[in-house]
Amino acid sequence: AFEEYGMRDAEIAARYYQKLKAFAETHTDSSSVPATASGLAVRILLSQLEQQGTSFHETFGFEERTGVYWNNVKGSVVTRKSTVPTEMRSITEPFVSKCYHGGRNECYTFGPTPVSVWNDFDLAGAYTTGLVDLRPIDYDNFWYTKDERAFVGHVVGFALVDFEFPADTKFPCLPVEGSNGGLFYPLSGRSYCTAPEIEVALGMNCSLNILHGVIIPWCDAEDGGDSRIFEEFT
C-alpha cells in the first residue's frame, strides 16, 4: 500500500510538470519551465508586451548598457551587457523605495474574543484591479512639490511628511517604520508615504506638512499614456 501511495505521488508530480510545461510553451513560446510561479508570470508578461509592440525598457524605465571587464579565467577583457535603471529613474528610485511598505496587516484583538458576529471584508479582485489601473509613466519629467493637493487624484506621487491626526481617529492610515522593520500607524509622526495614502489622510482631517515630495507624471497619450500596461496580462 505504501509503495502504491509513493508511486501515485510521483505520478501527480510528473503530470503537473507536463501540464505546466505545455502551459509555458503555449503562453511564452519556450519549452523551459521557470523554477517559480512568479518567474513564469514574468515570462508571460514579457511575451505579451513583445506581442503588443510595447517596450519593456521604456515602460519601466530601464536601459541596456555595455561594460568592459577583466576576466581572470580567460585572462582578457570581455564585454558584458546589463539592464539597469535609466539615469532619470535612478534619481528618484531610492526615495520612492522608502515610500513603499507593502500591505497593511494588523491584529486588533489579543487572546479570547467575545462571542459575536465577526465580519472579514475583502476587495474582490483588488490586485488585478490595481494592476489594470497602471499606465506608462514619464520618468524623465518628474517634479518636486510640497503642495498636499498635488497628491490628490490619479497621481503617481511619493512624499516624506510630518503628520497629526485628530485625537479621536480610530485607525490612522500613515505608516511609520519601526526599528525592527515592522509598521506602526500612530496618530502623529513622520512617514514615507504615497499619494493614495496622503489623499486618504486628508479625507480623515489629518494635518500634513510635506517635507519632500515628488510627482512622476503619466505619459502623454501620444507616448502611450492611454494604454494599460497589465490589461492583457490580467
Language-model-derived ranges and their functions:
Residues A1-T234:
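Conserved acidic
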